[in-house]
Structure formats: C-alpha cells, structure tokens
Amino acid sequence: SFIERRGLYEARGEGEKAVDAKQGGGGDAARNDEPFFAARRDELQGRVGPRRFRHSLGVSDTAGELAHVYGVDEGEARLAGLLHDWDKGLDDPGILARADELGLELSDELRSMPRVLHGITAARALGRDFPELSPALLQAIERHTLGAPDMSDLDMVLYIADALEPGREGKRVEKLRRQIGK
C-alpha cells in the first residue's frame, strides 16, 4: 500500500506489534470509569478549541453506537473516541516537538506531514500519562488517521466514527451511515 511503501508506519517502536483485540485489551478501570471519562473530557476541553471538542464528543458517541452494533466494547470505544484528537490542538512545530519529546523515530516522509502525527503522539502521550488505558485503545487512537493493514475491530470502529460523527455532512457520509449494521 501507499502507506507501507512510504514507511509511514515506522513510528512504531522496534518490537512493537499490533494489538489483536476485538473488545479491547484490558483497561477495564479506565473504560468503565465515568469519573475518569469526565476528567479526561474536561481536560480535553482545555486542550482543543470548541469545534474540535464538539467533534470529539460526537466521535465518542458515534464510536459507542458502532461498538454496540458490531460487538466491540462500548466503553472502550467511547473513551477512544473522546481521546482520539488529544494532540490535534498542537500546531505543526508543536506536534514535531511532541514527537521528539516522546522519542518517536519518524521517517522523513512522515515528518514532512505533521498534521497526520496527532494520533501517534496522542497515543504515546496518553499511554505514558494514563497507564490504565489499554493497549487496544491506544492502538486505535494511533491508527485513526492513517489506518493500518491489520486493524482490529476497535481500530475500525474509531476510524469510521471519526468519519461519520454527527458534525460531518454530505451525501457520501449519509450513504455510509445507511450502511451501518448491514
């Protein structure tokens, strides 16, 4: 694929592999903890602008709905939806500085496209700051922009929820929404 040929997955550390999880991978305390969810929601509101915050709430709700339809852990999906744009408020120099701070080894190609790094940096920073988050949730956040050849069900739920949340409009989006559950 284009992504593989360009080495866009090189941000994955040596020895790291994909999480093969339909329902998540642990993290019960975080995904089913409403105070944790509420605290992260409040923190997110201070990190991103109002439009991005509404988008994240919409992705969270949509991810929960999709998870219900497709048999994926709803709490894990809601939390992934809420947190997926955790680093989206950073500008290009800020996102590159964040990647450096986190010790990410990025290909030149990926470094030249800082707008797509927010999922990768968010996943790494959230994993560091909130170790109770599951590897499956963090993987879904990392992959929500570029995807991956071996996406888990949770990865796909978040990827699609980001595209279909209520703030997105258009014939293509409406057509995709009608396909849910078919």
Question: Which residue ranges define each predicted feature?
Answer:
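Non-catalytic terminal extensions that flank enzyme cores
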Residues: S1-A39
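Divalent metal-dependent catalytic cores for phosphoryl transfer on phosphate-bearing substrates
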Residues: A39-R47, H55, G64-K182
